[in-house]
Amino acid sequence: MVRTKADSAGSSASSGSYRKAVAARAPRKTFGSSSSGSNHVTSPTGKKSESKYAGGNPVCVRPTPTWQKGIGEFFGSPSTSQPEKENRIPSDDEEAGGSGAGKAPRKSRPLPPDPSEEAADSDDE
């Protein structure tokens, strides 16, 4: 612990007990009526700030690109949107559980012999 000058001055230092130094706190912003009007800070855009933060950069406002989807499309109810392939019952020609990427079954076949390995094998003999 740290002793301060106030702790060393006086009779309390001789008794061995001392007080811990407490850091000062920064003043907090108050969102309401304030006693002094000079402390009132406005937003950089000059507009009155809304009660909720809507995201984005308030200093350099940029337009939303046309390709960006709206947030309502993500939270829309599934009954109004078209059912996804994952959520519907597979038809007879589809196989359940398959990704559908490769329709033909793949057969494993050995790799062709490497010519550099064959040359190394013939040198050993």
UniProtKB/Swiss-Prot annotation:
Q: Which Pfam families match?
A: PAF (PF15715)
Q: Where is the composition biased (Acidic residues)?
A: 115-125
Q: Which GO terms describe its biological process?
A: centrosome cycle; DNA damage response; DNA replication; regulation of cell cycle; response to UV; translesion synthesis
List the subcellular locations. Answer: Nucleus; Cytoplasm, Perinuclear region
Biased composition regions of type Low complexity, renumbered to the chain: 8-17
Top-level taxon of the source organism: Eukaryota
Motif mapping: KEN box? 85-87
Protein name, per record: PCNA-associated factor
The alphabetized UniProt keywords are: Cytoplasm, DNA damage, DNA repair, Nucleus
Matching entries from InterPro entries are given as: PCNA-AF (IPR040444), PCNA-AF_dom (IPR031444)
Q: Where is this motif: Initiation motif?
A: 95-107
What's a single GO CC term here?
perinuclear region of cytoplasm
Role of this protein? PCNA-binding protein that acts as a regulator of DNA repair during DNA replication. Following DNA damage, the interaction with pcna is disrupted, facilitating the interaction between monoubiquitinated pcna and the translesion DNA synthesis DNA polymerase eta (polh) at stalled replisomes, facilitating the bypass of replication-fork-blocking lesions. Also acts as a regulator of centrosome number.
Q: Where is this motif: PIP-box?
A: 68-79
Gene Ontology molecular-function annotations = chromatin binding
Origin organism of this chain?
Xenopus tropicalis
Where is the stretch described as Disordered? 1-125
Q: Describe the protein's quaternary organization and the partners it interacts with.
A: Interacts with pcna.
User: Which intervals of this chain are the motif D-box?
Assistant: 28-39
